[in-house]
Amino acid sequence: MQIHPLITDSKTLAQFCARIAKSPYIAVDTEFMRENSYWPDLCLVQVADEHEAAAIDPKAPGLDLSPLLDLMVDNEDVLKVFHAGGQDLEIIYNLTGKTPHPLFDTQIAAMALGLGEQIGYGNLVDAWLGVQLDKGARFTDWARRPLDKRQIDYAIGDVTYLIQIFPKMLEELRRTGRGDWLDQEMERISDPSNYENKPEEAWQRVRIASRKADVLGRLKALAAWREMEAQDKNLPRGRIVKDETLADIASHPPRTQEDLGKVRGLSATWKTNDIGNRLMLALASHAPLAKEEMPERDPKRPGLGKDGALVADLLKLLLKIRSRDINVAARLIARSDDIDALAAGVREDLAILEGWRYEQFGRDAVDLVEGRLAFAVKNGRLKMTRTQ
């Protein structure tokens, strides 16, 4: 495989993209920094096909990334291969308003092949290629220039091994009849709505004990305000106001801006500064949370009650058994919210009642809930037995 020098000019990038656009699939990875910012700071993009690989420097002055981004989001003829690509997809979405398609995520594929729920890239490379990666450069400050050869080689290794692993995984998925199992997951992670930062939904990420409509309404207004402040200033949310402080203000709202000086987690300057004024305006604009927006009393167990919670526990035990028996990560088979919904009596719009998930788990899950299936221990091994 030909490894190119770091690409820093538009002509070289356009030529590279034109060549790899003829490949049926490419491997993609990014390096970024976001410890001190709201938006991830893209520092490096690595791309490889079966014949060549390169790292692209998006910070190079005058570099036009359009050929690369067009290849990612507009070329449907090239499959894009990522490993644990959620943050890579977020970055591409932020730049283009689109997500790569079609795509393949090797971490999700590994779940279907019994390699655990969140296998790291190093372990994946070791498992499939028998190569132990040098991890010496993983804590690099990717925003700092210049990058040395060791750092660039480390970054390119993320795609040169990935491009070798993909066809092996694909062959194994086909051999085991599990290739189609991943289609729904790949469509799910490529859905652009996953990467939209909607201020009006930000409150759902803040932990708060209260379930009162007026308190949650204040939290919704405050979290939306904080989200917009963080986006505008490009600062982490916690640098604006920490979650616990936001929840405290929603639960015990100050009457005046001067009262902000008494709030734990805010400095005395909030009594008089502009950001304190904006917080108070957001607080004044709130409305009680609408009934349809109200969270369940226990968000982990929606409307289950004690018996329903026990049924959900039994379903999760069944899930462990099926995961063990078919050697597929439990997380790929069923999500906790689907299991809780099934335990609560829901029978529609559940992924576990469709396709391969129904065949491998959902049918037995319904039978367990409806009394046609029970647990049994035979020769020290937990199994399922039919009751009728």
Swiss-Prot record:
SMART domains: 35EXOc
Any one GO cellular component localisation term in the record: cytoplasm
Molecular-function GO term, any one: nucleic acid binding
Presence of the UniProt keyword Cytoplasm in the record: yes
Enzyme class: hydrolase
Keywords: Cytoplasm, Exonuclease, Hydrolase, Nuclease, tRNA processing
A GO biological-process term: tRNA 3'-end processing
EC assignment: 3.1.13.5
Catalysed conversion reaction: Exonucleolytic cleavage that removes extra residues from the 3'-terminus of tRNA to produce 5'-mononucleotides
Cofactor: a divalent metal cation
Domain HRDC: start-end pairs: 212-293
Cell compartment(s), UniProt: Cytoplasm
Ranges for domain 3'-5' exonuclease: 7-173
Entry-linked NCBIfam families: rnd (TIGR01388)
Similarity comment: Belongs to the RNase D family.
Task performed by this protein: Exonuclease involved in the 3' processing of various precursor tRNAs. Initiates hydrolysis at the 3'-terminus of an RNA molecule and releases 5'-mononucleotides.
PANTHER family: RIBONUCLEASE D
Protein name as catalogued: Ribonuclease D
Organism annotation: Sphingobium indicum (strain DSM 16413 / CCM 7287 / MTCC 6362 / UT26 / NBRC 101211 / UT26S)
Gene: rnd
